[in-house]
């Protein structure tokens, strides 16, 4: 299976930033204009975009909708959005903006019944985001660690009809140390869900390893790449070639 690559834009106060391990105080501004960042991704061959409304994640309410709408309209990319999405109304608002998929995180722990209703209503437009540290789920914009195992939550979500999952190892996010490939692959194998790997991709080799697992039949749907692109570790065009989304000559 050829993986989808999702270059990431994290929005804080309308700007494109990256955090270290989810800490708002450790935000680095990479682009005053997120729309320009998205256009550059598109020019390099992207067809998808991962957007996190960081203000929304911490405030629990929409903050950057105007920017999200602009990103969709100006880039033409297929956009998935996470951050502070905790009601059916909010999901509907985002889908009406033109968002392809919404990522539910905290609400999967706090209100699984809502997830079930969301899946019944919006089907595969609903993706669950599981953020974990040492195998345990974190919620509220990563500020609070629970005693729930990532796999247990994934299996619970599968029971209510969820098919897609974004898995982030918080300890790796923004650190450029490489993703926790073993945990990601294990979660995909044991849950049977389509898993998008997130957090820590730092080298093209990380993407090669993930793509090799996908080629072996592991249900790895894709990977989210953030800081490595902004830091210049590799280009998006190079990353797309590794997963076969772009030919060698392009």
From Swiss-Prot:
One of its GO terms (biological process) is L-histidine biosynthetic process. It comes from Desulfitobacterium hafniense (strain DSM 10664 / DCB-2). The active site is at residues 10, 131. It catalyses: 1-(5-phospho-beta-D-ribosyl)-5-[(5-phospho-beta-D-ribosylamino)methylideneamino]imidazole-4-carboxamide = 5-[(5-phospho-1-deoxy-D-ribulos-1-ylimino)methylamino]-1-(5-phospho-beta-D-ribosyl)imidazole-4-carboxamide. SUPFAM superfamilies: Ribulose-phoshate binding barrel (SSF51366). Pfam families: His_biosynth (PF00977). Its EC number is 5.3.1.16. GO terms for molecular function: 1-(5-phosphoribosyl)-5-[(5-phosphoribosylamino)methylideneamino]imidazole-4-carboxamide isomerase activity. The gene is hisA. Belongs to the HisA/HisF family. InterPro entries: Aldolase_TIM (IPR013785), His_biosynth (IPR006062), HisA_bact_arch (IPR006063), Isoase_HisA-like (IPR044524), Isoase_HisA-like_bact (IPR023016), RibuloseP-bd_barrel (IPR011060). This is 1-(5-phosphoribosyl)-5-[(5-phosphoribosylamino)methylideneamino] imidazole-4-carboxamide isomerase. Gene3D superfamilies: Aldolase class I. The keyword Thylakoid does not apply. It comes from the Bacteria. NCBIfam families: 1-(5-phosphoribosyl)-5-[(5-phosphoribosylamino)methylideneamino]imidazole-4-carboxamide isomerase. It is found in: Cytoplasm. HAMAP family: HisA (MF_01014). CDD domains: HisA.
């Amino acid at each position: 299976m050829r993986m989808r690559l999702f270059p990431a834009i994290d929005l804080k106060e309308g700007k494109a930033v990256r955090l270290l391990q989810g800490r708002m105080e450790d935000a680095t501004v990479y682009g005053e204009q997120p729309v320009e960042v998205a256009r550059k991704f598109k020019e390099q061959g992207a067809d998808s975009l991962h957007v996190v409304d960081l203000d929304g994640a911490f405030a629990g309410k929409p903050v950057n909708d105007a920017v999200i709408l602009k990103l969709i309209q100006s880039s033409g990319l297929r956009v998935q959005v996470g951050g502070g999405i905790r009601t059916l109304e909010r999901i509907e608002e985002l889908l009406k903006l033109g968002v392809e998929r919404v990522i539910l995180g905290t609400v999967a722990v706090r209100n699984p019944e809502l997830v079930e209703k969301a899946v019944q209503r919006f089907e595969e437009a609903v993706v669950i985001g599981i953020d974990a540290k040492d195998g345990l789920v974190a919620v509220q914009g990563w500020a609070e660690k629970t005693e729930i195992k990532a796999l247990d939550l994934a299996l619970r979500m599968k029971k209510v009809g969820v098919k897609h999952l974004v898995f982030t190892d918080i300890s790796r996010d923004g650190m450029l140390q490489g993703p926790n490939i073993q945990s990601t692959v294990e979660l995909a194998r044991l849950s049977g869900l389509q898993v998008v790997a997130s957090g820590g991709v730092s080298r093209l080799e990380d993407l090669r390893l993930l793509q090799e697992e996908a080629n072996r039949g592991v249900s790895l749907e894709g990977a989210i790449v953030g800081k490595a692109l902004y830091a210049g570790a590799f280009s998006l065009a190079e990353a797309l070639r590794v997963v076969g989304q772009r030919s060698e000559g392009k």
